[in-house]
Amino acid sequence: MWDLEYCKDLDLQHNLDVMHIEKNICDSIVGTLLNIEGKRKDILKSRIDLTHLGIRKDLQVQDEGKPRDMAPAVYVLDKVKRKEFCKVLSRVRFPHGFASNPERRVSADGNKVQGLKTHDCHVLLQRVLPIILRGLGRPKLYRAVAELGQFFKELYSRNIRIDALERLRDKIPTILCDLEKIYPPAFFDVMVHLAVHLPDEALLRGPVQYGWMYPIERRLGTFKGYVRNRARPEGSIAEAYIAT
C-alpha cells in the first residue's frame, strides 16, 4: 500500500471498521467475564506475564503454577455470578426490530453467551453490559466499561459536532488507562488500541455510518442466500442475481 504514488497524499490512509473493532472489544470483555474458552484473556500465561513484569502482585502466578492457582480477579465472574449474568441477559427485551433476542445467545446450561453477532455486541456494550455489571457489584469494572460504551455511543451519532469528536479523542486514552488498571496486559490486543484512532478518522471522514461494514455485511448475507451449489458458489450467486 505504501508503494502507491497517491498514498502520501491521502488524508484518510486507513478506513478502520468501527463495527468490527467494537465487536472484538466486546467479545474480549464478555469472553473474559464469563471465562469462555478461546475468547478469554485471563489465562495462565497472562498471569505469569504479571510476575515477569512485577505488577499486580495480587494476581501473579509463578512459572510452575497451574490454572487452579490463579487468584480470583474482578474482571472474571465465578460460576454463580455467570449464571446470574446469563439469567439477566436472557430476560432483556427490546422493541421489535431494535435487536435480536438475547435469550437465543445464552447457552443451554445458562453458563455462557455464544454466537454474538456484530449488532448484538453493539447493543450489549453500549446499553446492556454496564447495567448488568453494576447489578453484579463490580463498581470499578462497571465505570470503565460504561465509559467505553458511552464512547462508542457518542461516536455512532448520526449528527456529531467537531468539538464532540475532539472531546472523544481526548477522552479515549483515559478510558483505556482505566481499563489497564483492571485488565492484564494480555487483554490489550491491536483491536483495543485501534479505538484511539477512531475519533481522528471520524474528523476526516465524517460520521461512522459512511465507513462501517453493516451495509456490506447485509449485502453479502443476501448473496450467500443465493448459493445453491456449494461447489460453485460464484456461479450460483451470478445466476440468482441475474434472475432477480
Model-based region annotation:
Residues 1-244:
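A structural signal for the principal folded core domain
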